[in-house]
Regions:
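Contiguous beta-strand/loop segments that form the cofactor/metal-binding neighborhood of enzyme cores
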Residues: 1-69, 99-108
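Solvent-exposed strand-loop boundary residues in beta-sheet-rich modules
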Residues: 58, 77-79
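Active-site loop of classical SDR/Rossmann-like NAD(P)-dependent oxidoreductases
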Residues: 87-99, 115
């Protein structure tokens, strides 16, 4: 989510808890950008509630639940009452994404496809670097 919103960071560090099988079960990543640092904590080994929060000088956004579901989010702006939004029209979390893809294909919007690919590449580059930094090796390495 962080790379999707803010782009590729200037640098990133990752501290991982590595399981018996050599794979990270949880960890914290810090991503440095011009003017701010973003952090992410993830835990495959925990059943704790998920949420994400973006905090800035003029306000904040908080979403409870897994970021890939986004059932609702609350926006708080300095000097205003927070407002909560629930924009999902469907029960399944992926219907909106499928509709967007269908629209992109119908319009032959290859620019949107390329933008999505660029984001995916940026995310994978950050994740690959973080994995190697944490000493996590795959057989294919």
């Amino acid at each position: 989510l962080i790379v999707s919103l803010f782009g590729r960071p200037k640098s990133a560090i990752y501290g991982a808890n590595v399981g018996f099988n050599g794979i990270d079960t949880s960890g914290i990543m810090a991503l440095r950008y011009d003017g701010f640092v973003a952090t992410a904590a993830a835990a495959k080994d925990s059943d704790s509630p998920s949420f994400f929060m973006i905090q800035g000088e003029s306000g904040w956004i908080r979403a409870d639940g897994a970021p890939n579901e986004l059932p609702s989010f609350t926006v708080g702006l300095r000097g205003s009452e927070p407002k909560t939004y629930a924009l999902n029209r469907y029960e399944h979390r992926m219907v909106h994404e499928f509709e967007a893809m269908q629209d992109i294909f119908a319009r032959k919007d290859y620019m949107s496809v390329e933008e999505g690919m660029q984001t995916s590449r940026a995310v994978m580059a950050v994740m690959e670097k973080a994995r190697l930094m944490a000493g996590i090796q795959f057989r294919a390495d």
